[in-house]
Amino acid sequence: MKEKKPRLFGTSGIRGRFGEKVTLELTAEHRKALATHLGGDGEVVVGYDTRTSSQLLENALIAGIVECGCDVTRLGMVPTPLVGYAASRLGAAAGVMITASHNPAPYNGIKLWNPDGMAYRPSQERVIESIIHSRDFKRKAWDELGSITTVDMRDDYVRAVLETVEIKKPLKVVIDSGCGAASHLSPLIFRKAGCRVITLNSQPDGFFPGRDPEPVPENLSELMETVRSTGADLGIAHDGDADRMVAIDDQGRFASFDKLLALMAREIGGKIITTVDASLCVDECLGDRGEVIRTRVGDVHVANTIAEEGARFGGEPSGTWLHPDFCMCPDGILSALRVAELVSARGPLSELLEEVPSYPNIRDKVPCPDEKKDIIMERVAAELSDQFSETSDINTIDGVRISLDDGSWVLVRPSGTEPYIRITLEGKTEEKARYIHERTRGYLENVIG
């Protein structure tokens, strides 16, 4: 029986603890595989975040790329959106970002980008994995090695971003970059856009001394309090690589991811791409101004569907947004500026958020051994709808999403990183949400055993 090779790529590139899953050896092999895949020809742009292991990994990565014949353009310590932008702007064969995004300091990772700034698709990642497992690297002779150059793309990126936004009136904005890769760039762009900026955690530091890189409410108490105490119009927080952003309204409250996505969808209109776990409020807020199309969870799937549908905007309910008029790479800095643009034109964010309907939601997980996930999900697809008498639609593009006649819904998906089956649901009322949760969890506990 042929041995099954382990998957190296997860839902967002290769990611894990440095020295354990993410090692110098794996990084070098990964880069050799990329350069081999590219035929030992072309330019690869490389950036990294503020983590203590990032420059070390960059050195291993560059060595592997050059050894197999590709040229390297070093961007330095930059946020992920700048890597995607540089890949498309410079006509590179690929882009590489060394980052673990929102994960804690001991973690690091590698994510790949296409020439149009879109993340590598799963099919492309499997090709890289196959080359790594086979060790069929196409090394070059001493006189065919790639070259290494360093380019500063920050000014170019700043100019390009500012051309796409217009802050109609000056705003006071508090920016918490979390000591990540946007620590200098995000405040700089906001100032150039005409905002008065107060910064928190704006010193690049891979130990993340100010807060955890994950921009969730429990990590943003200082930002929320600063917005309140300074009378700011808006608060912005980024994760470690700034492919995401979150917003704090003018009352110092965390802005719901789904509601913020809904507001931006309404503002832009047309075809809007989001994921199967996004709230019904996105559909209701957009109304007849456009169409919501749902796809699999993950920014690469959102990007692919944007390209296929010719959509004007797409995003996940995690603060990961894509703006195809600029670049197909998720961009937390541009997203934050467009929220500021919305506030400057439409009024206080707290009032705008009140215009978006709220529905009770529940997120839960049920223990399930990894080896049982496939068979359990087959049963879920065939049987879960029987738990409800008013099913209107079943979507199996990513897990199983069941919509009920009143718009309530439940999504069941296997975790890609933990031994759990995850439940996400939304009910039109608290009672309906509890009912859906009880029926779904009870069913899963019964079939998992």
Curated annotation (Swiss-Prot):
Entry binding sites for Mg(2+): S101, D239, D241, D243
Cofactor: Mg(2+)
EC number: 5.4.2.10
Cofactor: binding comment: Binds 1 Mg(2+) ion per subunit.
Protein origin, superkingdom: Archaea
Classification via SUPFAM superfamilies: Phosphoglucomutase, C-terminal domain, Phosphoglucomutase, first 3 domains
Keywords: Isomerase, Magnesium, Metal-binding, Phosphoprotein
Cited InterPro entries: A-D-PHexomutase_a/b/a-I, A-D-PHexomutase_a/b/a-I/II/III, A-D-PHexomutase_a/b/a-II, A-D-PHexomutase_a/b/a-III, A-D-PHexomutase_C, A-D-PHexomutase_C_sf, A-D-PHexomutase_CS, Alpha-D-phosphohexomutase_SF
Residue list for modification Phosphoserine: S101
Post-translational modification: Activated by phosphorylation.
GO terms for MF: magnesium ion binding; phosphoglucosamine mutase activity
Active site feature: S101
Reaction catalysed by this enzyme: alpha-D-glucosamine 1-phosphate = D-glucosamine 6-phosphate
Keyword Chaperone among UniProt keywords: no
GO biological process, one term: carbohydrate metabolic process
Xref: NCBIfam families: Arch_GlmM
Role this protein plays: Catalyzes the conversion of glucosamine-6-phosphate to glucosamine-1-phosphate.
HAMAP family named in the record: GlmM_A (MF_01554_A)
Family the entry assigns: Belongs to the phosphohexose mutase family.
Name listed for the protein in its UniProt record: Probable phosphoglucosamine mutase
Lineage: Archaea, Methanobacteriati, Methanobacteriota, Methanomada group, Methanobacteria
